[in-house]
Curated annotation (Swiss-Prot):
UniProt key word NADP: no
Main function: Exhibits S-adenosyl-L-methionine-dependent methyltransferase activity.
GO biological process, alphabetically ordered: methylation
Upper classification of the organism: Bacteria, Bacillati, Actinomycetota, Actinomycetes, Mycobacteriales
Identification of the protein by name: Putative S-adenosyl-L-methionine-dependent methyltransferase Mflv_5024
Species per Swiss-Prot/TrEMBL record: Mycolicibacterium gilvum (strain PYR-GCK) (Mycobacterium gilvum (strain PYR-GCK))
Residues the entry annotates as binding S-adenosyl-L-methionine: 129, 158-159
């Protein structure tokens, strides 16, 4: 089903299922003694959602090696790069900038960074997502006896609504610098909503604030990449259709938008990110599909 204004979801449907998919990938990459990332709670959460395909992914019960798009190791490499970039961004922000003691995770889904990262003392981590998603994750981890590693504060609201007011009501201080992450979020917003989100972040960001998100090549959202990933998902038993979940239409890149409103930006291409993490360069056919996509970091002077 195509996206509509005001549509809703849970962790087993629509956009919510993509959060479960990413958590399943983190669980898959966290298995074994030589795992390249460590998300000890991803499998627990995926199993609690209960979608059979993603439970099998999390447990390592699906054989991806014969897939014509990319196999198991390539899937691990991708989620390792993505997870490390956002993990390291939050960790480095707190270590390099002693004044940054608040972080905001937008569309937090099944993100467990508030529980598993080593946060500086006094850090407040705000998680924003739909109320049902927030409540589900909180309940599962609480029932398992898992406690946050920082002062975790949840903000249950759709990002298409007045989330800045809800964030401030939860204790957020816009006069203090903030570390923001928007992982796997922007393609699921209409172009105008993406611009409004970035403007809201800017309005809430004191000097010294930092932001990390993906830099998306617009043609990858509705072109061959989205179609190829949808076909791959179906080959392995998932019915997620990214071509229906991504929004069409001309889109100003987050890099361009943030630069125009005073942020200093830097983009690391996906290929460079792979090489920096010790993996070989991305195959030419995959690069042709993802275009100039990569990872964006920004600093507000």
């Amino acid at each position: 089903m195509a996206r509509t204004d005001g549509d809703t979801w849970d962790l087993a449907s629509s956009v919510g299922a993509t959060a479960t998919s990413v958590a399943a990938s983190r669980a898959f990459a966290s298995r074994g003694p030589d795992a390249l990332i460590d998300d000890p709670y991803a499998r627990l959460l995926v199993e609690a959602v209960g979608l059979p395909h993603f439970v099998k992914v999390a447990r390592g019960e699906i054989d991806f090696d014969g897939d014509p798009l990319f196999g198991a190791q390539q899937a691990i490499n991708q989620i390792v790069v993505r997870t490390r970039i956002f993990d390291d961004f939050l960790t480095d922000a707190g270590q390099r900038e002693p004044q940054i003691r608040q972080a905001v995770i937008l569309a937090s889904g099944l993100d467990t960074r508030a529980y598993r990262l080593d946060w500086p003392a006094g850090t407040v981590v705000y998680e924003i997502d739909q109320p049902e998603v927030i409540d589900f994750k909180t309940a599962v981890l609480t029932d398992a006896g898992v406690a946050p590693a920082a002062d975790r504060r949840t903000v249950g609201i759709d990002l298409r609504e007045d989330w800045p007011t809800a964030l401030r009501d939860a204790g957020f201080d816009p006069d203090r610098p903030t570390a923001w992450i928007a992982e796997g979020l922007l393609p699921y917003l209409p172009p105008d909503a993406q611009d409004r989100l970035l403007d809201s972040i800017t309005a809430l960001s004191a000097p010294g604030s930092r932001l990390a998100t993906e830099h998306m090549d617009a043609k990858a959202l509705t072109g061959d990449w989205a179609k190829a990933m949808t076909e791959r998902a179906r080959r392995h038993g998932s019915d997620i259709d990214l071509t229906k979940l991504f929004y069409n239409g001309e889109r100003r890149s987050a890099t361009e938008h943030l630069g125009a409103v005073g942020w200093q930006t830097s983009v690391q291409t996906s290929n460079d990110a792979y090489i920096a993490n010790g993996f070989g360069p991305i195959r030419d056919d995959l690069l042709a599909m993802i275009g100039d996509s990569g990872y964006l970091t920004a600093w507000r002077p």
